[in-house]
Amino acid sequence: MKIVLNKCYGGFSFSAKACEALGLKSRYTIIARNDERLISLMEEYGSEWVSGDLAALVLVDIPDNCTDWEMDEYDGWERIIYVVDGMLYHA
């Protein structure tokens, strides 16, 4: 499963171009991090095109066989914690 995370301090936000492509009114609109449209934009245009000010959005791939996942955040910097076969991992 692919998920979009912010990998810098500051916070998750979109560029004006990404907002327009996604039909969002605000750079700070919350959408599912595994939204197919968002994943497609990241794959087609890349992080710099999609990321807003003070954001460095990245595409993270976690195993499809994970049984649970959760996003962890500190001051805008995010990571995914997920479970596979009863073991915890992070990305």
Walk through the language-model features, giving the residues of each.
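Catalytic phosphate/metal-binding cores of nucleic-acid and nucleotide-processing enzymes, i.e., regions
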Residues: M1-A91
